[in-house]
Amino acid sequence: MAERKLKPEIMHLMILDNCDHKCNLCCNKMYDIDKIPVATVEEMKTVHTVCITGGEPFMSNINIDRFALNLKKQFPNVENVYVYTSGSAFVFNIYNFGYNFLDGINFAPKTKGDWEQLKYASAHLREDIRESIRTRKSNRLYVFKEHVDLFENNYKYIAKKLNLNVLYRTWDKEFKTPDNEIFRRLPILLN
């Protein structure tokens, strides 16, 4: 019996390769960025979820929330737009724009500095911004095994305060995209 090929439902969309971290196990070191296929209109018409990734998306020169709105307007099939961030650049850009069209923010702190930025954000954000984050469809906080003790002893309350679903993870040395997902990039990276 021939293997059935699923149509892609989820697109991980790299919008830039710029990042403020030099993580030892960064997944961007696993592939040649120039060989990542460019997202096509045909592919965009098949997905219901777009996960904005980078590099660090909040270091781009665009308004991420407006980008999410434009994706949904141009591709009505796109129901969900999520963004992945280490947290630091997100906190530095928090007041530059609102969070009305993103369906969720996935935080993946990689350093103690990232954790401290999330701590600062949870304590000092304006209430309207904090509420905007809390009311997204799905917010996640990825806690890598190297940071479990740090998280459990110092930062666990942040997840509750910002309504983040905690997912404990290990660094994958090799990322394999599931059959119903694709990894693409913009034709011009927004560094």
Question: How should these model regions be labeled?
Answer:
Residues 1-36:
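Canonical Radical SAM [4Fe-4S] cluster-binding loop centered on the CxxxCxxC motif
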Residues 8-10, 45-49, 78-80, 99-102, ...:
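A general structural motif
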Residues 11-13, 50-52, 81-83, 105-107, ...:
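Hydrophobic faces of well-ordered beta-strands that scaffold small-molecule active sites
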Residues 29-41, 58-100, 109-119, 147-151:
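Canonical radical SAM enzyme core domain
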Residues 38-56:
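Short microdomains enriched in Cys/His and/or Lys/Arg
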Residues 41-44, 95-101, 126-136:
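Acidic (Asp/Glu)-rich catalytic clusters
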Residues 97-105, 159-164:
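Glycine-enriched alpha-helix->loop->beta-strand junction motifs that scaffold or abut catalytic
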Residues 131-191:
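Auxiliary Fe-S-binding modules of radical SAM enzymes
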